[in-house]
Amino acid sequence: MADRYINPKVTTVSTGIPGRHIWSARHNHVVIDDSAAHDGPGDAPGAGELFLAGITGCATLMMERLARSSKAPLKRVEVSMEGLIDTEAKREGPAVFESARLKFVMVGVNDTQAREMVETYKRR
């Protein structure tokens, strides 16, 4: 049986290169760059992309868990996400997403099963 509580931990550190940081979780490391528009290197994924990646990663894992628990014949799931940030919006603090859209593609389940799994995801 799974533990009741999990406690994910991450750390991000600057590298001495303006706009470049290293994000770490356990023994895994990812380079994060600020965009060239903000004077960063712009080569590695940015914080907004990693934020969206966290959401899509959670969604794919949950679809697999839901399929296993309901014995649905899910063979593959792909979740993509895009967001819109207005860099010229007049507000205090950092830029925020104006909107974001998730797209689910599932193979092996019928449309009804796929819709039910997505609705369950949206409620959690």
Protein language model regions, located:
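Extended beta-strand/beta-hairpin segments
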Residues: 1-53, 65-124
